[in-house]
Design a protein with these regions (language model features):
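Short regulatory alpha-helical coupling segments
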Residues: 251-252, 265-285, 316-324, 342
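Active-site-proximal structural segments of metal-dependent nucleotidyl cyclase/transferase enzymes
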Residues: 271-303, 319, 330, 349
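Hydrophobic framework residues that shape the active-site pocket
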Residues: 296, 315, 329-332, 337, ...
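Active-site-proximal alpha-helical element of nucleotidyl cyclase-like catalytic domains
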Residues: 307-328, 336
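Catalytic-core segments of nucleotide cyclases and related cyclic-nucleotide turnover enzymes
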Residues: 350, 382-413
Length: 414
């Protein structure tokens, strides 16, 4: 478990902050009430970050901030007196942020800031600028915000990275660059990635007011004019990443089955139509199967819908853990699921589904009264898909029907 160090001489406040961080974010939190205690902790451990009171009894002039930065730890400064002079002095240092410690809202802000930094570790940012000095400056600021950073010198290199690295969240690009400038890059990126997929922020010293509108109309999410403060930079980056996460959350809810967390029927067809056409055109071997729980109505009638839901979730877990990352499994509704195994031979597909059938057959669902129940599935496997996706699903359904008619707990294939 990652650790956070809180350094604050007000013991009540320090304990309150530590407790909220532990309960809400899951970090192990250690508390020091003086500069001396903090030094002892820092000698023994490294921390995800430190929350540091600027004015301690044995370090009244903020000496602790420089000491912790020199030790290689990240710092968020706590202060009860934030004014323009304070801001200017703090922003000269390589701190993450500063926070007022006046009340409950300030503590909530601390929690939100740490939560944001924790999430930032999951994101990659691509910095595109022909100035090595500026690239390194951007990289340093972004890494201090816990982002993973890739840097390149121009637009063509950026497109190459985007083609080979699939999980980039944000592109931070300069305008004027050799080979391919930022505007051309933005236009090219938007041919492949929507604003729901990837955020683009332009940074430029161009003083023409039309430039901002030009970039925004070409698909940029935001535009930062040089020179800018570190504070403005971090706020804009964090806000853009948070907006992207919110879009992902909304989209994910729309695409997921509420009970199992698997994809739903809507997502399956939206995703499968383009894949199906390309796979047929490329002669890619793939398999479509429809899976149904045997005697599910009897399970519901005998044990109730809560147990029925538990059985559905048990099957969902088995399906989820027995497919590869590229395959698709979706709950079509009720007790019926559909699976597409990609880049697989018929022999391999049948072996995989037999393994799934056996795992389900051997699964035991324990009830609260210590009773145990078992269930089975029937599977219709289409090894050689039809001309269209709809025809293929219908054919797999017919094979499933045959499996039911021929005794259940079995696989039928074409």
């Amino acid at each position: 478990m990652e650790k956070i160090l809180v350094v604050e001489d007000n013991k009540t406040l320090a304990k309150l902050i530590a407790k909220k961080i532990n309960l809400e974010l899951g970090f192990e939190v250690e508390v020091a009430y003086s500069f001396l205690e903090a030094k002892l902790f820092l000698k023994r451990y490294s921390y995800f970050l430190t929350l540091v009171d600027l004015n301690l009894p044995d370090a009244p002039n903020g000496e602790i901030v420089d000491h912790i930065l020199e030790s290689g730890n990240h710092v968020i400064v706590l202060s009860g007196n934030i004014d323009k002079t304070f801001r200017a002095n703090m922003l000269k240092k390589n701190i993450i942020d500063y926070v007022n410690k006046g009340g409950v809202d300030d503590i909530n802000f601390i929690i939100n800031t740490i939560a944001r930094l924790k999430k930032n570790k999951e994101h990659k940012i691509l910095v595109v600028d022909d100035s090595m000095v500026f690239r390194k400056q951007m990289q340093s600021m972004l890494e201090n915000m816990f982002f993973k950073v890739i840097t390149v010198a121009h637009g063509e290199e950026a497109l190459g990275i985007l083609n080979s690295v699939s999980d980039i969240s944000l592109v931070l690009t300069d305008y004027h660059m050799p080979v391919m400038d930022g505007l051309e890059l933005t236009t090219e990126i938007r041919k492949k990635y929507t604003k729901n997929d990837l955020t683009i922020i332009t940074i430029s010293g161009d003083n023409d007011d039309d430039t901002t509108a030009m970039f925004l109309k070409s698909g940029a999410n935001d535009y930062i004019k040089k020179p800018f403060s570190k504070e403005e930079f971090s706020c804009r980056i964090n806000n853009s990443i948070e907006a992207l996460e919110n879009i992902y959350t909304i989209t994910n809810h729309a695409n997921r089955d509420f009970l199992t967390g698997l994809y739903n029927r809507r997502y399956f067809f939206n995703n499968m139509f383009p894949y199906f056409e390309k796979a047929i055109a490329d002669s890619e071997k793939f398999t479509i199967a429809v899976i149904d729980i045997d005697y599910f109505k009897k399970i519901n009638d005998t044990y109730g819908h809560e147990i029925g839901d538990r059985v559905i979730n048990n099957l969902a877990d088995i399906l989820r853990t027995n497919i590869s990352q590229d395959d698709i499994v979706a709950r079509f509704g009720g007790e019926e699921f559909c699976i597409v195994l990609k880049n697989i031979t018929p022999e391999q597909a049948l072996s995989r589904f037999e393994k799934i059938r056996e795992k389900v057959q051997n699964t035991i669902v324990s009830l609260e009264n210590e009773e145990k129940i078992k269930f089975t599935v029937s599977i219709g496997v289409l090894l050689h898909p039809e001309e269209t996706l709809e025809e293929s699903i219908n054919q797999a359904d017919m094979l499933l029907y045959n499996a039911k008619q021929n005794g259940r707990n079995r696989i039928e294939h074409n």
